[in-house]
Amino acid sequence: DNVTGGRLLDTTFSVRAAAGTAPIVAARYEFADASLRFLRIMPLLERAAGVGFLQDHQMIVSLDRGVVSAPQGGLVNAAGTSFVILDTRIKGGDGQVSLALDGSITALMSLLDVEPLRLISKAGQSVTLADGRGSVSGSLQFPLRKGVPPNQIKFDVAATLRDVRSQTLIKDRDLRASRLALAADNAGLQISGPVTLDGIAANGSWNQQFGAAGRGRSQVVADMALSQATLDTFKIALPPNTVSGAGRADITIDLVRGQAPAFKLTSALRGIGVAIPAIGWRKAQNAQGALTVEGSLGPIPRVDLLELSGGGLSAKGEIILNDQAALDQARFSQVRIGNWFNAPVILRGRGKGQPVGVLIGGGTIDLRGASFGANGGEAGPMSLSLDRLQITEGISLTDFSGDFTGRGGFAGEFTGLLNGGPAVRGTVAPQRGRSAIRVRSDDAGGVAAAAGLIKSATSGTLDLTLMPASGAGSFDGDVTIRGLRIGDAPTMAALLDAISVAGLLRQLDGQGLAFDEVDAKFRLTPSQVILTQASAVGPGLGISLDGIYTLASKQIDFQGVISPLYLLNGIGSFLTRKGEGLIGFNFNLTGSAASPSVSVNPLSAFTPGMFREIFRRPVPEVTE
């Protein structure tokens, strides 16, 4: 049944026998133009030529030439293939085929997929999984009897696949390779080597496990190039200008029959720059980082998890694409940047070529280290609803809400509660690569009290401007208050008592002292308020002040002049500072801001205002 034709050449046959022993049979023959079948499961081998041996209870047939007409894909060259019956004395013993096949990939795959092998079908693939050429080597071992079940066929096959092209291994993805290695045994099937996937270079393997555990599923594991082109190829839509440079990533793709391929990509981001311009963060290409992306590939990919760290940032979220596979939302449940940003962030797509919109709901931002506006480029709208916006040590806005744009820098309007107290409103504008702030309130006294400056202040309107100054987290401030009233204030009482102004003391204890105008200039740093010039004037009193307030310890070191009866005394103020009359008392306030030490120089009252400088130290200086 296994030989249907051919010619025998140079046949030799010998039998040796000795008394009491089984005869020893040996033979050698050559054959040509043969049509034969090595295996019942395989197609007929045609135009076969080779040599056969029978020796030492083994039969060996080796092909010098011959072709197999595969079920699909054309002819396969089988030259070099051999067949061995391992022990002719055992009926139904094992036979072994050593394969040497060359042909189209489709033809080779169809031979590996004949019943009962079904190696390719077991992998959930078609024999037309790829175009190209291939060479197969390896062995098959099986019992020589009819009806052998597949689990009794042992195989270990290797193949080299050349000029490979496939859109089947990974559905709808163009996979190409100049050379791939195939390995198959009873445990599973693997195809590995360098490839391009839709033009993206990768080096990896496709693995299929046989048996119930691997039925209908396989896996691709690869090391691949990572750049903006990679993201574009896989339709992973990130905000514009997110990725620059190029590096490597490890990717795993799980292929399950009837489902979109699921993937996981990880990278140390070496050589890759990553930026979120909308919140002022950037990782340089030479900086270390970490990226994890998990989701599924399909007409509209999904990114269920995106974790990013590096350059002081850690973020975790997901990406949602719209029906056109463009960015709808990038939702991050938590984003941390250094010690200045800790909040959830949503980035909203606004169409091709448009900067994303930003929604920050909850969390905290510390403007002392913020880099909003530092990029100075085009940016989309930003809406913030923060638990706290920290401006400097001891000064923050809670329940902060604002809407901003990034066009040319960070700018917009906001509302909030100063240190959880009085309501303020304001504007932010880009300045010197940072943010300038203007704050206004209809409760100047409440603002002064909430800031810890004057606990008993009430009424009045406030207009405060903070301009970025040299040094991180430093601002030059200018404040204007109109209509302020100060009630029970121990420090003020101590000053008035020291200069024996009984009427003003009674006024302080009653309805409070009125100050029509309060003006100040100062430098705000992360650790200090440096008051360079301040004045408060009202009908009964004028005050000038300068010095330093240390924020962390709440210690003060101020000096100034207090001028009673300012309505009359202030007539000569053009010769002095604002808030000082012709007659005034030099004073110093030192120690705790809550309960400072008060000292007054009574002799200064007899010194004309223009010469009063002899009783005071120089005004604190600030660098430009």
Describe the residue ranges of each PLM region.
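Solvent-exposed beta-strand/coil patches in large extracellular/periplasmic or lumenal scaffold regions
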Residues: D1-T88, L119-F210, S218, R248-D323, ...
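Predominantly extracellular/luminal regions of secreted and cell-surface proteins
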Residues: G95-D113, I486
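Flexible glycine-/small-residue-rich
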Residues: L101-G103, G362, S441, I481-G483, ...
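CBM-like, beta-strand-rich accessory domains located in the C-terminal region of large
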Residues: L108-A123, V127, R215-V221, A225-K235, ...
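Extended Gly/Ser/Thr-rich low-complexity repeat segments
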Residues: L111-E115, L453-K455, T576
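Surface-exposed, gly/pro-biased binding rims or lids
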Residues: K235, P239, S563-V598
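N-terminal accessory interaction module
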Residues: R331-L347
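Flexible beta-edge/linker motif
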Residues: I346-G363, A469
